Each structure stands twice: as C-alpha cells, then as structure tokens.
Amino acid sequence: MKVSVTVKPYARQARVIATDQGLIVYVDAAPVEGKANRRLLELCARHFGVARSQVRICHGTSGRHKILEIS
C-alpha cells in the first residue's frame, strides 16, 4: 500500500493525523542527517501496526511531501 505523507519537522509532540489526502505527520526531530525521516518511519509503523522494516520512503527523501510504501 502506498500513502501520501506531509511531514512537519520540529514539532513539540510527535503525532500522526489522517486526512482525505493522506497523512500529516508531526515529527519531533530536526531534518538533519536523516533524523526526521527515521522518526517518520517509526511513527508510521506504529500508526499502521507493522514493523519499522515494513515501511519505506518511495519518493521525497529530501522534501516534506513523501510517498511511503507499507508492506
């Protein structure tokens, strides 16, 4: 399954919000050296109830708009 995600870094509290267009993920990490991407994968894995290894970024590794693949 592929999911469209908008990432909001530097959030005070990490959370995932489902919308009609996909997910908005507030990440409590800085977008430096992949820290925000790693935290994004952890949060999405927890949200969908799968292992972190089953979530990967298909498109948008360096931007705020991403496509995730959950297997």
Label the model's feature ranges:
Residues 1-34, 38-42, 50-52, 56-71:
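Contiguous, often N-terminal, cationic amphipathic patches that form binding interfaces
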Residues 45:
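The alpha-helix within a helix-turn-helix
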